[in-house]
Swiss-Prot record:
Disulfide bonds: none annotated. This is Capsid protein. It holds the Pfam family Nanovirus_coat. Keywords: Capsid protein, T=1 icosahedral capsid protein, Virion. GO terms for cellular component: T=1 icosahedral viral capsid. InterPro entries: Nanovirus_coat. Belongs to the nanoviridae capsid protein family. Transmembrane segments: none annotated. It is found in: Virion.
Amino acid sequence: MVAVRWGRKGLRSQRRKYSRIAYKPPSSKVVSHVESVLNKRDVTGAEVKPFADGSRYSMKKVMLIATLTMAPGELVNYLIVKSNSPIANWSSSFSNPSLMVKESVQDTVTIVGGGKLESSGTAGKDVTKSFRKFVKLGSGISQTQHLYLIIYSSDAMKITLETRMYIDV
């Protein structure tokens, strides 16, 4: 089955269906890798974006993998949000430490997912923790919208963020 026909979906009637099968449009995977140092008791964020240029795409789902090196007993809260406009200042948009969306940006920000990560271990040794979050974005995020990972850390720590974006170009 080499013929590709996208555009037609659904039924004409219950007895008479479309004669040709409608296939899904092609999707591709884009992987990115970012390393950063988080400051103590600070709200920071990173934009999840497949391309730096203005090519046309629609993101359908994202897999976020974060690995953190932190001291025992520390806490990391994170939110995954989508926004119609770019977020310039993280601290003015999200509360500290609970990461609640402030009233000034409530109309433009939608929370997609979130969670927390706590470390345990013996004192004096750093602990490496990680989380993997798979986020389905429904109808998708176009190139005019923005997807962010917002992080609050209770202590200074190193983070490695890897993302795999499933996009339709």
